[in-house]
Amino acid sequence: MMMMTSLGGGAGGGGGGGGSGGGRFVTYPPPLSVPPSAPQSPNFSGGLRSQPSFLVEQEKYLSELLAERHKLTPFLPVLPHVCRLMNQEILRVTTLLENALSQSRFDHPSPLASGGIFQNSRADMNGWASQFPSERSVSSSPAPNWLNSPGSSSGLIVKRTIRVDIPVDKYPNYNFVGRLLGPRGNSLKRVEASTDCRVLIRGRGSIKDPIKEDMMRGKPGYEHLNEPLHILVEAELPIEIVDARLMQAREILDDLLTPVEETHDFYKKQQLRELALLNGSLREEGSPMSGSISPYNSLGMKRAKTRG
């Protein structure tokens, strides 16, 4: 339904005059509504929706968003606002999904939350899908969300890189790479999307296949394979915020690189829960969920093969 608002008559604002020119109407379009495919919170005025049905709808919508974001990757430099809005919607949906999956977030904060990314949200964005090429890096660059940030008026964009060492010498049997990547590389993807930094795992052990790593060692572009396992964090941002974003990413990574006893590792439990959800094997309160609801099983999305 269209809405009409009456604007006052003459400059004096006075009434008077019986003519029809005493006022004018401006027609407004109806407020934007969320598309039918965009699921809301499981709590509606009509009652509580079934948890499994809600999760399936959420994951289906999320897979559509992820597929569209993947298609937008080549256009990030020319469509920054669109990409920023897309990231915000992905965050909204993953927040709802995470709230539905876990009721104990406050008791077990994730490293992402402690890093200050989601200070006003209970979610750590479990549910993102990603595609990552060689050396365990995430493929798509994060969409800039700093366009309207205060203090970015200088227009000077700088590129900076920091290195974060992985303590494999102290904990040789700890699976740091798996903890960093998460299911389908989602955990690393969330760090990238939330900090506007690119995160790459480099060094010995950064290629999944040891035989392939031995083959690539010494070749151009793979010199890092002679170094200990480490992380490179790259940021190309306005000079006013680039250091803050790099430090934000470093703080999150430091948390992820702190070994936790498996029985108390809530973050790993959430990763396993996410993997079960993506594989379609998650069971909520005894309610069966048939079929896979992985984002890769819809819209023709395929997992990217790695060179390593």
Curated annotation (Swiss-Prot):
Origin superkingdom: Eukaryota
Alphabetically ordered keywords of this record: Nucleus, Phosphoprotein, RNA-binding
Intracellular or extracellular location(s): Nucleus
GO annotation, cellular component aspect: nucleus
Gene3D superfamilies linked: K Homology domain, type 1
InterPro entries listed in its UniProt record: BBP-like, KH_1_KHDC4/BBP-like, KH_dom, KH_dom_type_1_sf, STAR_dimer
Modified residues (Phosphoserine): S294
Stretches assigned to the KH domain: 165-232
Residue ranges, annotated region (Disordered): 1-26, 284-308
Molecular-function GO term, any one: RNA binding
PANTHER family xrefs: OS02G0722700 PROTEIN, RNA-BINDING PROTEIN RELATED
UniProt name for this protein: KH domain-containing protein At4g26480
Principal cellular location given in the protein's record: nucleus
Pfam families documented for this protein: KH-I_KHDC4-BBP (PF22675), STAR_dimer (PF16544)
Regions of compositional bias (Gly residues) in chain numbering: 7-24
